[in-house]
């Protein structure tokens, strides 16, 4: 765990090292993934079955989950879990419903009609991780924006190691209205969604997080299909003053550290004594935390505490780090928030732990990682929509602007472009 002070002579060098820290998988899986994708593309269901048997030790007659099986598994959830899923779905839906954009259409001063129509994607694949990362919240965060956008066909893949699945995942799928679900995972699931098999019709876009093999598979099928992003390890940056309870902040830092040994948790504070209290609280919690093996590895190898002269000094540092999650645990957090240009999502004030956003705050928890918040945003309704623009010229409009189009086409050395306009202008002149 790294402790930095902005007053230290070597701060700039050490901070830049932190900024450039690459926490993605160091093992190159591209060759293995390329082989899996090629095999799935060539052999379809047989290849999917082969890899599922090898990696998940599961060989069902069909990977398609029946409505009866989904209902049976979902019914295993307690009433409390079902109610929590329904509340989360309600809040996520409400926030994303407000994102729906309006079409644009107008006629300009020369009579040209111009416009832009928003059109939903036809079919989308949602990858839901299995094993340790089998999260019902991921189902809601990926499926509900697609449903609200108007996607007609939503396909979900989720691995079932040894034939087992978290019932809450299927309960979330029920609530989100996802009915086409296949018990496959890994690069083979991405290949099946992208290329199709005898039983799985290919989709237009694939969204959802996964391990290094899933991430690489999404990278390789991009172009054949669209993808949301290449997800890296989780990140949280907490800006906190000494008025906070250090134990609260320690729990916040560990909330991301427990995701992955490569996750990163950073505290920025203007109080050295408070920083030490938080470090002590983290170490104390780790002695009893059930996920301590993962969280300890993350905290020791990638955690950081940065002590600044004042909290205003945190802003340029934060914008360079461009973290996935940012907590502003201060009074009047909007003052700092208004200066933040590079972050996946903000959690404002002392009573908004990032975990609220993970589950049921409303905004999406699928967020840019690995400093991609410099240029990317979290998943939203817009990820499931396309924009189609249109133009319509009447005779007068074409006569008003056509000759300039001819001039530009001739300047670019494209005579057929020029001719397609010129013949119409000539025809109008001959009328």
UniProtKB/Swiss-Prot annotation:
Pathway: Amino-acid biosynthesis; L-histidine biosynthesis; L-histidine from 5-phospho-alpha-D-ribose 1-diphosphate: step 9/9. One of its GO terms (biological process) is L-histidine biosynthetic process. Substrate binds at residues 234, 256, 259, 325, 358, 412, 417. Keywords: Amino-acid biosynthesis, Histidine biosynthesis, Metal-binding, NAD, Oxidoreductase, Zinc. Transmembrane segments: none annotated. It catalyses: L-histidinol + 2 NAD(+) + H2O = L-histidine + 2 NADH + 3 H(+). Its cofactor is Zn(2+). It comes from the Bacteria. Zn(2+) binds at residues 256, 259, 358, 417. One of its GO terms (molecular function) is NAD binding. InterPro entries: Ald_DH/histidinol_DH, Histidinol_DH_CS, Histidinol_DH_monofunct, Hstdl_DH. Catalyzes the sequential NAD-dependent oxidations of L-histidinol to L-histidinaldehyde and then to L-histidine. Belongs to the histidinol dehydrogenase family. This is Histidinol dehydrogenase 1. The gene is hisD1.
